[in-house]
């Protein structure tokens, strides 16, 4: 017997899961279980299937009804002869109503049900073989099962269903009334009561009422689902209505979007207008200031570049040098000495580079600095000479004096001579190769001969090192050989102060020469 195909497995489980009792989990009652316990033939959810796996395969064997495709015919027969309804009734009959998984499936009732499912599945496998359906199972209908009624499909053709329902509904109501009327008339004729006309009046009214009800029901049926279900009457809307409503909604959305854009653009325009007004006011104020100052040419450009209180300031409050500047006329003006080098330069030479001012000699400077010519100039010349001496140089090997430098030994002139000299030696050093070893040995022998008469020697004496000074002999010059004294420090401070004052005087003089005249 071969294994069932994938299509057979899907067909069988589709039918088994259509049973209402199999649509919920056997243990917890969760909807749409997709796992199954073959041992008991019940359907489980994924959480309960994990609990069954922890019990072991000897108590419960778990398979997926959707993912697993290696089902056997015996396992399918277990699911067909079992089911949630059969298992629930069997456990209830044997008094096993607990919800504890371990206690429930380790009980005597679970053991009996396992044996029963196994026996029934073996019998069904031998009897039916590879047939999809058993005699005990409900044979699937030849026609497809009725589908659930679609809401929109019922709207598409409401007249047919409603008219059929309406035509079938009033027939039972007509039959008893028609039967009662002849009975009443037949009973009235032989008896011949005292007043037959009075009896005919209510019957006509009743017939009229029946006819009115019959006429109203088809009209109510045309209203769609409202008449069919007996609830509020819902009217069918055509496709054109939906299109019109959608167009109206789109038009409303467009209008709202335009209103939002207009509302957003209005404050922006107001801010732009206000900023333009402020800009025009600033320009007017600036023009008035320019007219008052009567500045033109290089002076105006220079003042704007320096930012001397003009309209370029960020805040509303600013200090203006040019606005407070006044022209002072001297009674006996002194003509300034011509400056050839500084006159040729651009007007902003003092602000672009300051090193050129200090590089010039003292004789070329203004007469206002004559007090510095005698003292500072001579001192600077001496200071430059002094400063060059204490600056230590990073002397290399070639800058050392010749007395301390060891002459480089000449390399061997001929390689054959080196081979003859060191041919039998196993290892040689660079000193031996270049002839330095003999000189070192000579110096060592000389030191040993000099110290041979002494009773004790030290490593400093042996290697000709200078003795270290005692603790009491340390002084400032030995610890800091290049430390400056107070006189040099004072002279340095004076020189720096003199340079700063000269620079400040030069700046002020240049400003007065350019903007004061």
From Swiss-Prot:
Ranges of compositional bias, category Basic and acidic residues: 291-305, 379-390
Name its GO BP terms in alphabetical order: COPI coating of Golgi vesicle; protein transport
The chain positions of domain Arf-GAP read: 10-126
Q: Where in the cell is it found?
A: Cytoplasm; Golgi apparatus membrane
Which keywords describe this protein according to UniProt?
Answer: Coiled coil, Cytoplasm, ER-Golgi transport, Golgi apparatus, GTPase activation, Membrane, Metal-binding, Phosphoprotein, Protein transport, Transport, Zinc, Zinc-finger
User: Which residues belong to zinc fingers classed as C4-type?
Assistant: 25-48
**Could you identify this protein by its name?**
ADP-ribosylation factor GTPase-activating protein 3
Organism (species): Bos taurus (Bovine)
Could you tell me the gene encoding this protein?
ARFGAP3
């Amino acid at each position: 017997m071969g294994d069932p195909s994938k299509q057979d497995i899907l067909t069988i489980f589709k039918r088994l899961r259509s049973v209402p009792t199999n649509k919920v989990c056997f243990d917890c009652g969760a909807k749409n279980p997709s796992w199954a316990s073959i041992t008991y033939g019940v359907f489980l959810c994924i959480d309960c299937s994990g609990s069954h796996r922890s019990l072991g395969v000897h108590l419960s064997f778990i398979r997926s009804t959707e993912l697993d495709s290696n089902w056997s015919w015996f396992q399918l027969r277990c699911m067909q002869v079992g089911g949630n309804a059969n298992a629930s009734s069997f456990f209830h009959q044997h008094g096993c109503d607990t919800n504890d998984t371990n206690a429930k499936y380790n009980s005597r009732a679970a053991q009996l049900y396992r044996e029963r499912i196994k026996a029934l599945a073996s019998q069904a496998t031998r009897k039916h073989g590879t047939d999809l359906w058993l005699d005990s199972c409900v044979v699937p209908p030849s026609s497809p099962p009725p589908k659930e009624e679609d809401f929109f499909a019922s709207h598409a053709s409401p007249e047919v269903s409603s008219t059929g329902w309406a035509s079938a509904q009033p027939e039972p109501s007509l039959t008893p009334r028609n039967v009662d009327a002849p009975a009443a008339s037949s009973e009235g004729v032989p008896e011949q009561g005292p007043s037959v006309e009075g009896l005919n009046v209510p019957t006509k009214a009743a017939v009229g009422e029946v006819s009115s009800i019959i006429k109203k029901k088809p009209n109510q049926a045309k209203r769609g689902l409202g008449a069919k279900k007996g609830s509020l009457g819902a009217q069918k809307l055509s496709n054109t209505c939906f299109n019109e409503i959608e167009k109206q909604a789109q038009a409303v959305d467009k209008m709202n979007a335009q209103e939002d854009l207009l509302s957003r653009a209005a404050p922006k325009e107001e801010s732009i207008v206000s900023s333009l007004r402020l800009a025009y006011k600033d320009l007017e104020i600036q023009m008035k200031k320019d007219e008052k100052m009567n500045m033109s040419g290089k002076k105006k450009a220079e003042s704007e570049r320096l930012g001397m209180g003009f309209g370029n300031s960020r805040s509303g409050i600013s200090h203006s040098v040019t606005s407070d500047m006044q022209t002072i006329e001297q009674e006996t003006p002194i003509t300034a000495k011509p400056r050839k080098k500084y006159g040729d330069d651009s007007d902003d030479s003092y602000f672009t580079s300051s090193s050129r001012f200090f590089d010039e000699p003292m004789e070329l400077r203004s007469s206002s600095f004559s007090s510095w010519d005698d003292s500072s100039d001579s001192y600077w010349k001496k200071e430059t000479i002094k400063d060059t001496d204490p600056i230590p140089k990073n002397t290399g090997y070639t800058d050392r004096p010749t007395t301390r430098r060891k002459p480089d030994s000449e390399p061997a002139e001929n390689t054959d001579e080196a081979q003859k000299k060191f041919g039998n030696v196993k290892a040689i050093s660079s000193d031996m190769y270049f002839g330095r070893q003999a000189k070192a040995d000579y110096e060592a022998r000389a030191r040993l001969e000099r110290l041979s008469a002494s009773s004790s020697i030290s490593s400093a004496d042996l290697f000709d090192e200078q003795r270290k000074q005692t603790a009491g002999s340390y002084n400032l010059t030995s610890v800091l050989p290049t430390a400056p004294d107070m006189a040099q420090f004072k002279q340095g401070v004076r020189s720096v102060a003199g340079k700063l004052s000269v620079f400040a005087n030069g700046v002020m003089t240049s400003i007065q020469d350019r903007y004061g005249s």
